[in-house]
C-alpha cells in the first residue's frame, strides 16, 4: 500500500489517508463486520444529485434499503463522518439536517472521530430519537 493512502473496500481503490478518511474507513469496517451490512448495499460519498439533480453535496456513507423495496431516498442508514476536532456535534447535526430534506433513512449514525451517536426514525412522529446502537442488518 503506498504511503499516505488507505484502501477503500467499497470503492475498491486507494484513497488519501486524511483524518476524516480514517474515520470513514473505520466506520465501513464496523458496518461490514459488526452490523453485517452486505458490501454491495454500501455507497461511499453518495452524490445527492442522484436524488435531486439540482442538489449538490455528498453523504459520507449510505446503506441502501433495496431489500425492503425502498426507494433511493429511503435508505436503511445515513452516516456522516468527521475527523476529531473538525466539527462540533451541533455543526454535524446542521449538516445532517440539510441531507434530511432529501433523504428519509431508517437510521442515522454520526461519527465524530471515535465518538459515535446513533438515531432511529420514529414512524409516528417522524423524528429521530437517540438509540444505544445500530441493530444488525437483516
Residue spans for each PLM region:
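A short, conserved, highly charged catalytic patch centered on acidic carboxylates
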Residues: 1-107, 113-138
Amino acid at each position: 500500500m503506498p504511503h499516505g493512502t488507505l484502501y477503500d473496500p467499497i470503492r475498491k481503490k486507494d484513497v488519501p489517508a486524511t483524518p476524516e478518511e480514517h474515520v470513514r474507513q473505520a466506520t465501513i469496517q464496523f458496518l461490514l463486520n459488526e452490523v453485517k451490512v452486505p458490501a454491495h448495499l454500501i455507497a461511499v460519498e453518495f452524490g445527492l444529485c442522484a436524488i435531486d439533480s439540482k442538489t449538490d453535496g455528498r453523504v459520507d456513507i449510505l446503506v441502501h434499503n433495496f431489500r425492503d423495496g425502498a426507494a433511493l431516498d429511503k435508505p436503511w442508514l445515513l452516516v456522516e463522518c468527521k475527523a476529531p476536532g473538525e466539527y462540533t456535534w451541533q455543526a454535524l447535526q446542521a449538516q445532517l439536517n440539510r441531507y434530511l430534506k432529501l433523504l428519509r433513512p431508517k437510521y442515522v449514525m454520526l461519527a465524530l472521530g471515535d465518538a459515535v451517536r446513533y438515531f432511529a426514525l420514529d414512524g409516528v412522529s417522524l423524528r429521530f430519537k437517540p438509540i444505544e446502537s445500530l441493530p444488525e442488518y437483516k
